[in-house]
Amino acid sequence: RRENPTVAGRDFELLPLREGRGRFLGSVIGVRPHGPHWWGEGEAKFHIDGDEALPTIVGTGSEDYVGLGWCVQATPYPYHGASLVEKSPLPDTAGPVSMYRWHLPDPIYWHGSMRATIQQIGVEITPQTAPRSFTQYLDCLRERQDDWSCCTFWYEPVPSAPLPPYPSLEERLRDLDLEPNLEGLPLQSGFVTQNTLE
């Protein structure tokens, strides 16, 4: 799934609503900031078994969800971390990142329904607004519109409800400055149908 840009005030969906029972395994999350300043104050939220207003599980920040703190560092641990952290040409900004969290030692099960999201909230700090207290820091929080993507893994019994339509390869790669080299790969509607990579 990819949303570029995300919609201010609407959480990015890691897992669309799934009904029935299942187990959430984790996500690989990509973020490309579209503006300056820190982007990672959004909370991961897990709405389990019908909770609406308040999710069963709520995190404290995007980097905290993947087991990091004080921004994102290239730290590939077995169950959480970041495998890619690039520098940004923008001041006071983390560049594009790829981070992940696997819920293997801390499984998340559901029995009725499940939906997982993460907020796009960041901090806008200038020399004039530099916070001197936690309350002032909270005043610097802003909804952001960046480029977020994810690949989420879960188990659920089949048959199950269909997923939202899968975007085309062109849409998934739009403005990434990548030329996909698919020559020689067996494709079916934009999917690699067997593992032929060495």
Role assignments for model-derived ranges:
Residues 1-184:
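Beta-strand-centric surfaces of beta-sandwich/beta-rich domains
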Residues 178-198:
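Glycan-recognition and processing domains
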